[in-house]
């Protein structure tokens, strides 16, 4: 995944035409599009190849099962044309290894959730988030998912993994996270959903957030 804008669109809409229109409108400002259950359950896996005309696709299925089932899920995900899959780490090393094994066969990537961005994410996942981050690095995952709503946790995770893994960070916009803060904290990409796809002009909303990120990099340099 090439880093240009450092922004990923979380396209959690349920209508095919709306999804394609938004993807086309904001493609200039995003490095990837993250799709999840709302869109896939409503439209089918076929939407992935259509969206891939505009940007690389990350399947946010938070895969969390036994190794054999994880392999089957990941096979279907990559056969559908996705470039990466998001999986849970709390299921353990063997389940994670199964996902990474299939991703390697397809030449694709795996992102592991260390912590989720909503308030409840601090209840059970945060206490084991650092252990999950270490496991993901040891297993050879491509990256981690860490919360933009808690930039200090992104900083902590970055210190643990160094530059071994990339960090993508959800929660910018509607959940209260600020793009510039989480980039400064150590994230490689921010994930933005409702602040873009629910905006009156998704393109303009994406442009403004991209400009905010660019300004943060200019300030750092």
Curated annotation (Swiss-Prot):
Keyword Lyase applies: yes
Pfam families: OMPdecase
Assembly and interaction partners: Homodimer.
Entry's Gene Ontology cellular component terms: cytosol
InterPro entries named in the record: Aldolase_TIM, OMPdecase, OMPdecase_arc, OMPdecase_AS, OMPdeCOase_dom, RibuloseP-bd_barrel
Organism: Methanosarcina barkeri (strain Fusaro / DSM 804)
Enzyme Commission identifier(s): 4.1.1.23
Taxonomic lineage from the root: Archaea, Methanobacteriati, Methanobacteriota, Stenosarchaea group, Methanomicrobia
Active site feature: 62 (proton donor)
Entries under HAMAP family matching the protein: OMPdecase_type1_A
Protein name: Orotidine 5'-phosphate decarboxylase
GO molecular function: orotidine-5'-phosphate decarboxylase activity
SMART domains: OMPdecase (SM00934)
Catalysed conversion reaction: orotidine 5'-phosphate + H(+) = UMP + CO2
């Amino acid at each position: 995944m090439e880093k240009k804008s450092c922004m990923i669109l979380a396209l959690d809409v349920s209508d095919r035409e709306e999804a394609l229109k938004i993807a086309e409108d904001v493609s200039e400002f995003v490095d990837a599009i993250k799709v999840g259950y709302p869109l896939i359950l409503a439209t089918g896996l076929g939407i992935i190849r259509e969206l891939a005309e505009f940007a690389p696709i990350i399947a946010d299925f938070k895969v969390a099962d036994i190794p054999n089932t994880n392999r089957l899920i990941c096979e279907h995900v990559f056969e559908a044309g996705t470039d990466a899959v998001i999986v849970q780490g709390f299921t353990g090393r063997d389940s994670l290894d199964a996902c990474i094994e299939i991703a390697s066969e397809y030449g694709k990537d795996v992102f592991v959730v260390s912590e989720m961005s909503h308030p409840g994410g601090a209840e059970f996942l945060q206490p084991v988030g650092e252990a999950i981050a270490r496991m993901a690095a040891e297993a050879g995952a491509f990256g981690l998912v860490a919360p933009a709503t808690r930039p200090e946790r992104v900083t902590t995770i970055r210190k643990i993994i160094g530059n071994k893994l990339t960090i993508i960070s959800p929660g910018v916009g509607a959940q209260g996270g600020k793009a510039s803060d989480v980039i400064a904290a150590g994230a490689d990409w921010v994930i933005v959903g409702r602040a873009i796809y629910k905006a009156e002009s998704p393109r303009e909303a994406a442009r403004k957030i991209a400009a905010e990120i660019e300004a943060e990099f200019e300030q750092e340099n």
